[in-house]
Amino acid sequence: MGYTCFCIMNTASSSSPACGVPAISGRIVGGTDAVYGEWPWQVAVTTANSLCGGSLINEQWVLSAAHCFDNSISPGNYKVSLGRYKFGESIASSVTVVVEKFTKHPNFIKPGDRGDIALVKLKSPVTFTNYIRPICLPNASVTFPSGMECWVTGWGTRRYGENLPSINTLQEVMTPLIDYKQCDQMYHIDSSTSSYTIIIQEDKICSGYAEGGKDSCQGDSGGPLVCEANGTWIQAGIVSWGDGCALKNHPGVYTLVPAYESWIKSYISDVKFVSDDQISGSPDLAPQHCGLSRNLYQASCVLICMNMTYA
């Protein structure tokens, strides 16, 4: 039993919100279910037979993993659900949009390769709400230090090999970052792969614990790995692959987003990227980095606390 608090923010303007700033916050440390509206950039990318995650980066574009998309399947057969909390259950805040096109990075050929990143254009733009908001993207200058605690979210399975449930609450887990060199060393422990063979490439970042226990899993692919800096959430990675789920010395592997700034910009000219200076908290470089006026970020917060019991 304990108190869970939600912060409902009332912005001073009805214009587009800043990226990476959820209207609702509240987290149960060590829990698994996310708070409704806590991760408003999280999307589900689905076909009749598949589920992946993704992140909203502006009104009409989503970032996901290349391995989630099959070139033999028409883009119109992919759908993107936004503002959703329980997968498989429609609510008033959620919308579903058909995909107009998807673009996979040319370096990607098969899972485990470099370039496991895809841009997804929605057939029509979405309206931002408290439950549908974009995530901030880091530019190529941004580095994410090992040990930084970040969050991964998705509707995937909780254990490797499980079938995806028909209705599943959005899950969240916090894990520390691991740089690709250290991660590569971990994957070589008790491995038959030669130590001279690179398993984790430089366009990746890992997140997890040496002892295992917390990780993304099946169905989470393409979803965001996000880190908080001065009240703004930045997407560090995209769920790419892993050996099982949450195994010892096998942390989750993510495509490193800042490595692909120029590629993303080549397709989306108006997407805004955050720099190291903006993340460091300079008073002149706060959330207005998304190209919006400063008065958008003058906000009041109504705090609602509920006494809840968890099994």
Identify what each model region corresponds to.
Residues 34-38, 56, 72-74, 91, ...:
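Extracellular/periplasmic catalytic domains that process cell-envelope and extracellular macromolecules
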Residues 48, 67, 83-86, 107, ...:
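Solvent-exposed coil/turn segments that connect beta secondary-structure elements
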Residues 1-63, 77-79, 84, 275-311:
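Protease-domain processing segments flanking chymotrypsin-fold serine proteases, especially trypsin-like
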Residues 43-45, 78-88, 137, 149-154:
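Short conserved beta-strand and strand-loop elements enriched in small hydrophobics
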Residues 106-109, 125-174:
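Active-site substrate-binding loop(s) of clan PA
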Residues 62-66, 114-139:
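Conserved active-site neighborhood of the chymotrypsin/trypsin-like protease fold
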Residues 20-29, 42-46, 148, 154-157, ...:
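Extracellular trypsin-like serine protease catalytic domains
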Residues 21-25, 62-65, 69-110, 180-188:
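Conserved H-D interstitial segment of serine endopeptidase catalytic domains
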